[in-house]
Every structure is written in structure tokens, then in C-alpha cells.
Design a protein with these regions (language model features):
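Extended, compositionally biased non-globular segments that define protein topology
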Residues: 2-4, 21-163, 168-210, 715
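Intrinsic-disorder-associated interaction segments
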Residues: 27, 31, 38-39, 51, ...
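Juxtamembrane/interfacial segments around transmembrane helices
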Residues: 132-137, 157-170, 243-258, 666-670
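Solvent-exposed soluble domains appended to multi-pass membrane proteins
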Residues: 309-715
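Membrane-interface segments at or immediately adjacent to transmembrane helices
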Residues: 208-332
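Residue-identity detector for glycine
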Residues: 13-14
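Intrinsic-disorder-associated, low-complexity terminal segments enriched in Asp/Asn/His/Tyr and depleted
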Residues: 7-10
Length: 715
């Protein structure tokens, strides 16, 4: 038997060596195994991230279409880009843990995402504004007060809510597939995934920087403005939430102040000749409408130069510079016209010009067509509805987006509030509200404005207080005896009878006055709105009657405007009252400002200047001859020659030159001419600065800082 041939490669150890081809096969198998493991570990992060990306993007688009009824290509693209890092981080949370935990976290994250977007959708449908993070901290108060109303709106919004709930059902049903078994992603991959999410966020922000076309560009909206509606519309709910948190923490970025502007020269007052009443009206009892001209400006001796020189904080230095360069409002023929009179100032819940009728509401009709008649008055809607409407009207400042401005002002020095001004002049000052005393923290803000404050639960008891809304008439019958015999009085009153919702099931005042509107040719909701506003009519009738009986009517000024338009009506329902389709950008906010005195009976002074609730406080300050600094207030005296500027929450505006629609980024001149883009950009910058520095006044207690330096600050 021939000897066995020994493999030379096997001689040393006597073992058989695996052939080269087998080694290559094993190597390929190992590579496939490693590759498969890599895919599985990355898949643990990618699969839930892709699912959440689809969920958030779908819900964001649904909200845009449901709330705004439009979707631009740019909005769709940027919403996707800014949704991607959010989805990646949530996917990391769900896929970066064990499968058992991930299958619990994925439905939970989906539910939270859907809850936040769904809540914003329903809230916007109710209040025509988006819910702020700050409001969440006060949610117990809101639920306690309007829980039934909220439940009713949720039930009425069953379709969008079901569309928001569907992804959570899918996440629960397919959780095993969406969070698959497999190797752990590992700390390194988790960090790289988070880094990729951050990179996508930075890239998206960089792309926004490139979008600078137009006046109110995407870049300007993202990096400067405080416009929740436009932010949601262009970037999505989650990006709007991020921008809001940034504003709350770091303030609103102003536009660069124009330091070259000099104070405007003293101008002739506008032509405000008394308009003769129609022949069937009673003759005027007084035609003394021309006080002696008193030259000067509404300013206080604030040394801005010293403030600027000594200020180390760049934000405050910028504020000092901007305020110092503002043109002060000149005094005019109407300065001090009402000096020494009493004042009753009413902010009426949901009041509208369209609620008035010479037959149903004769008192409101008379008051709105006599005295000062403002033909182009607007009540813009702000983010915190009634509270922000009050804040704008009573302070002449723009509320800061994302917070309860009136509540936060409670610890600030508010020297220009009429309560504090009149109290310093020896008046008895009161504030009344026929709803819960502490709602929106009014029990803190209103005393700080200089009032003895009464409301339900704090010195005011109403039999109608157990129903909603309570009765404005009953409140007026209770409160007038509290002040009418005072030597001098100044009264601020917030009504509630006109509050939503406008149905017979939910509105006690609509039920009370239903017979008066039952035959009107409108939908039930519109008739319910008109019915509940009739309670305000009766309250005003009672007020005038009690003043006249006490002999105080002739020496009392009555002011009334809305906190906001009745957003409890849909645009379609509001259009019923108008008789045509309402313009939702400007026309829907047009309203009535009543400014009437008993000695102006039968005479009207028509003012066609464009103005808004922002201008009410400085106008009253001028008429009553109060000391204030017009440079430190964002509104202006309507009766002065100051240029008009009506600012809306989305940065649309109306001025003496034309009107700007921020949604279309289009400025239209009144004279039909071609707008100058640089001039329009300067107008938008002015709006931005008024918004930003209103926020600075609130955030820094600016009045105290400035007036302490001038030796004029109070406690």
C-alpha cells in the first residue's frame, strides 16, 4: 500500500487546513451577519421614526387645511423639514430602548403628539387662536370655568378629533412591527442618530435663512416676528411651540431701530367739525367743541441720553434708543376737553357693530351715533382672547405672544393706567366684572391698575351668577349705587353676557331674549348671539337711567368697546349678519367705539381716521388732560394728527397710506399707486418694533426703570 501523501501545509501541526474557498464563504457569511445586525440596529431607530414622521406630518397638514383652508407648497416643504428632526428624536426615544419598553412608548408618543395637535386644532376652532404653553399652566382654572363649553366643542368637533385619534390606534395595533426585535442600537448609534436630527434641524433653519424674498419673508417670520398663526401656517405646530418658548425665555427680537428719525413738527389738528344731527333728532344742547389750543407734546421729562450712556444691558439700551427717537404725540384742540368729568369705561364681551339695531338696541344705537363717532375703528383679536383684549384697550400696549400679559403685569409699575391716573387726581376708582373674580388673575392685575376690584366671589353677588353667562343688567343694577354718589368717580367694567357659545342649550342670556329674535332671518347661532347682546342693551339703559336719576349724567363720560369680535360665530355665520361674505383679514375686525358724554346729547363728531382698541387709552388720557408719555405707549391719541396705524396679530396692518395683508405679503395703497418695497419694509419694521418693545416693557418692568430714573416712579 503506497504511503499517504502528506499535505505540506499540514505537516507541522498534523491538522487539516480549511480550503481558501471555504474561508471566503465563511467571511461572506460573517459580513452578511454583521450587515444584517447593523440594518436591524439602525432599523430599531428608523422604523419608529418614519412612522412618527408620517403621523406628525399628516396631522400638521390636516390642521392647516382644517383651520386655514389653504396649503402652500413652501408650507408643505418646511413643515416636512421641521417635522423630521422631531420625529427622529421621538423615534430615538422609542427605538433606543428595549423592544418591550419601546412598544409602550411608541403608542404613548403618538397619543401625546396627536393630543397636542388635536388640542390646538379644537382650541383654534373655538377661539381663533392657538393655545400657548403658558396657558397650560392655568388649565385647571380654564377647565373649572369653561369645562362644559369645552366638552361641547370637543363633541361638535368629532370629525377632526377622530382623524387625530386614528394614528394612535394604528401605533397600538402595529407596535410589534413598528418596534421590531433585534440587537440594541448601542450608545454610539443613538448619539449619531441624535446628531443627525440636530443636523437636519440646522439645515432646515439654514434653508429658511435663504428665503428672504418679499417684505414679510419666511426668514423674517421665523427669526423675528411673534405671529403664531403665520408660524403654524408656514412651519407647523411643533415649530411654533419652539419659537414661542424662545420668545418667552429670551424676548422678541426687534428690528434695528432707526436712530435718524427726528420728532415731527407740531402739526395742525385734524378737521373734526361737529356733524349736524338729522332733522328728526333733538337739537344739540352744547356746541362748545373748540377748546383753546394748548401747544405742546404728551411727554414726561425722561433723560434717555443718560439712560443710554449708563446702560450695560444691550437689550435695554436698544429700548432706550428706540423710545427716545419716537415722535411724541402733540396736544390738540381736544386736549383736556373732558377734564374734571367722571368716566365709566366698559369693555363689552363679544360686542359688535352688527349686534346693534335702532329697534332692538335703541340705547346702544343712540350712544354709537352721538358723541364722538369713529367710522374706521377695529378690535383686532389677540392670542389670549378677552384678557389680551382688555390689556390692549386699557394699557395701549400690544400683548406678548405666548403668555398672559395682563397677569404678568400685576407686579409691574403701571403709571399710565387710568385707574392709577384718576386715583392720583382724587377720584374714587372701581373695577367690576360679572364673572369669577380670579379668572385670568384679574384679582392681581386690576388692583395693580389702580382699582378697587369687585367680581363674583369678591364683593359682588348676583342671582344670575349660578348660570352662564351671568346678567350684565343685574350687575349694573348692583354696582351703580356703589359709586354714583361719590364726589368724583372713574369706573372700569368688563361685561360677560355676550360670551360664547351661542346656542339655546348653553347660553342663559340667549334663552332670556329669544322671543325678541326668534323671527329674524338668521341661523339659530346668529339669533342666539343677537339675543345675548340684548342683555348689554338693558345694562346700558339701566346705567343711563340711574345716572340721570342721580343727576350725574351730564358730567359723566361713557366709553364702550369690544374685547374682540364674536369669534364664537363662524365666518359663514358672521357673513349672515353682514349680508355678504366677510373678509377675514380686515373686515371681520371692524367694530364700534362708543365715546359719549351727557352734554353731547344729539351731536356727533365724526372721525374717519383709522384706529383700534390700542388707541383708546391714550385718546382718553388726552381728553381728560392726564399726564403721560406718548413715546412709551404703542397706541396714539385718535384725535391727534399722529399717523394712524392699526396692527393685527398676524402683522397685517392699516395706516394712512394703505393696508398690508401679511398672508399674501401684499401692500395696497389707498391712492392706487405702486407701493415702494422699501417703504413697506419700513412699515413692517415699525410693527415689529412696537410688538417687540411692548414685550420689553412687560418683561423688564420698563416703566418703573425709566420713571424711577426721572424721579417719578411710584411704589
Amino acid at each position: 500500500m503506497p504511503p499517504r501523501k502528506t499535505d505540506p501545509e499540514n505537516r507541522a501541526g498534523g491538522t487539516r487546513t480549511v480550503p481558501r474557498m471555504c474561508m471566503e464563504v465563511i467571511s461572506l457569511d460573517n459580513e452578511k451577519t454583521v450587515s444584517s445586525a447593523l440594518r436591524e440596529s439602525w432599523g430599531r431607530l428608523a422604523v419608529p421614526s418614519l412612522f412618527l414622521l408620517g403621523v406628525i406630518y399628516y396631522e400638521e397638514l390636516f390642521l392647516k387645511l382644517y383651520c386655514f383652508r389653504t396649503l402652500s407648497p413652501e408650507s408643505a416643504v418646511f413643515t416636512f423639514l421641521f417635522t423630521l428632526p422631531v420625529a427622529m428624536l421621538l423615534g430615538l426615544l422609542c427605538g433606543g430602548v428595549s423592544p418591550r419598553r419601546g412598544r409602550i412608548l411608541l403608542p404613548a408618543c403618538t397619543a401625546l403628539v396627536s393630543l397636542w395637535i388635536g388640542t390646538q386644532l379644537v382650541y383654534y376652532h373655538m377661539f381663533k387662536a392657538f393655545l400657548s404653553i403658558f396657558s397650560l399652566t392655568k388649565m385647571a382654572m380654564v377647565v373649572q370655568s369653561f369645562g362644559e363649553t369645552a366638552v361641547g366643542n370637543v363633541l361638535a368637533s368629532w370629525f377632526p378629533i377622530s382623524m387625530m385619534a386614528a394614528p394612535t390606534v394604528l401605533a397600538w395595533s402595529f407596535r410589534a412591527r413598528l418596534v421590531p426585535d433585534g440587537p440594541d442600537a448601542g450608545g454610539g448609534r443613538r448619539l449619531r442618530w441624535a446628531a443627525m436630527a440636530a443636523a437636519v434641524q440646522l439645515i432646515s433653519m439654514g434653508l429658511v435663512l435663504l428665503c428672504g424674498g418679499g417684505v414679510l419673508s419666511l426668514r423674517y417670520i421665523y427669526y423675528r416676528t411673534a405671529t403664531p398663526d403665520l408660524e403654524v401656517q408656514n412651519f407647523g405646530v411643533f415649530t411654533q411651540t419652539q419659537l414661542e418658548l424662545k420668545r418667552v425665555l429670551f424676548g422678541i427680537v426687534p428690528d434695528d431701530p432707526d436712530v435718524s428719525q427726528e420728532p415731527a413738527p407740531d402739526m395742525a389738528p385734524p378737521d373734526l367739525e361737529p356733524t349736524l344731527p338729522p332733522p328728526d333728532s333733538p337739537p344739540p344742547e352744547s356746541d362748545a367743541f373748540r377748546p383753546e389750543v394748548i401747544p405742546g407734546y404728551h411727554t414726561l421729562p425722561v433723560d434717555f441720553d443718560t439712560l443710554i450712556a449708563n446702560e450695560e444691558d444691550e437689550g435695554l439700551k436698544s429700548a432706550h434708543l428706540w423710545f427716545s427717537q419716537r415722535s411724541p404725540t402733540p396736544e390738540n384742540l381736544w386736549t383736556g376737553y373732558f377734564e374734571g368729568k367722571n368716566l365709566i369705561w366698559i369693555v363689552a364681551e363679544g360686542f359688535s357693530t352688527l349686534a346693534m339695531d335702532p329697534q332692538r338696541t335703541p340705547t346702544l344705537w343712540k350712544l354709537s351715533h352721538q358723541g364722538f363717532v369713529f367710522d374706521n375703528f377695529y378690535t383686532p383679536l389677540w392670542g389670549v382672547s378677552t384678557s389680551d383684549g382688555e390689556y390692549v384697550t386699557t394699557t395701549g400696549l400690544i400683548p406678548k405672544s405666548g403668555v398672559w400679559s395682563y397677569s404678568l403685569s400685576s407686579d409691574n409699575y403701571m403709571p399710565f393706567s387710568l385707574g392709577n391716573q384718576f386715583r392720583r387726581d382724587g377720584y374714587s376708582t372701581f373695577a367690576f366684572h360679572d364673572y369669577l373674580y380670579n379668572y385670568y388673575d384679574r384679582d392681581r392685575s386690576h388692583p395693580n391698575m389702580g382699582y378697587d376690584y369687585y367680581a363674583l366671589g369678591q364683593g359682588l353677588e348676583l342671582e344670575s351668577g349660578d348660570n352662564f353667562p351671568p346678567s350684565d343688567l343685574e350687575m349694573m343694577e348692583k354696582i351703580v349705587p356703589m359709586f354714583v354718589n361719590k364726589d368724583k368717580f372713574m369706573v372700569y367694567c368688563l361685561t360677560v353676557s355676550g360670551h360664547l357659545t351661542y346656542t339655546l342649550d348653553t347660553n342663559a342670556m340667549s334663552v332670556r331674549h329669544w322671543d325678541a329674535v326668534a323671527d329674524l332671518p338668521y341661523s339659530e347661532e346668529v339669533r342666539c348671539y343677537l339675543a345675548c347682546q340684548m342683555e348689554l342693551e338693558l345694562a346700558m339703559e339701566s346705567l343711563l337711567s340711574q345716572l340721570e336719576a342721580a343727576g350725574r349724567l351730564k358730567d359723566t363720560v361713557i366709553v364702550l368697546s369690544a374685547d374682540h369680535y364674536p369669534y364664537g360665530l363662524t365666518d359663514e355665520q358672521y357673513s349672515e349678519l353682514l349680508g355678504h361674505e366677510v373678509d377675514p383679514v380686515f373686515e371681520i375686525f371692524q367694530n364700534t367705539l362708543i365715546l359719549w358724554s351727557g352734554d353731547m346729547e344729539g351731536t356727533a363728531v365724526h372721525v374717519d381716521k383709522y384706529c383700534s382698541s390700542l388707541d383708546v387709552m391714550p385718546t382718553l388720557s388726552n381728553l381728560f388732560g392726564l399726564d403721560y408719555d406718548s413715546r412709551l405707549i404703542m397706541g396714539s391719541d385718535i384725535l391727534s394728527p399722529a399717523d394712524p396705524l392699526v396692527i393685527f396679530a398676524n402683522y397685517s396692518f392699516i395706516n394712512g397710506v394703505g393696508y398690508y395683508n401679511s398672508i399674501t405679503d401684499q401692500f395696497t395703497r389707498w391712492d392706487g399707486g405702486e407701493p415702494d418695497p422699501e417703504e413697506v419694509a419700513a412699515m413692517v419694521a415699525e410693527v415689529q418694533n412696537r410688538v417687540a418693545y411692548s414685550g420689553a416693557i412687560l418683561d423688564t418692568d420698563y416703566y418703573r426703570l425709566v420713571l424711577e430714573h426721572a424721579g417719578m416712579a411710584g411704589p
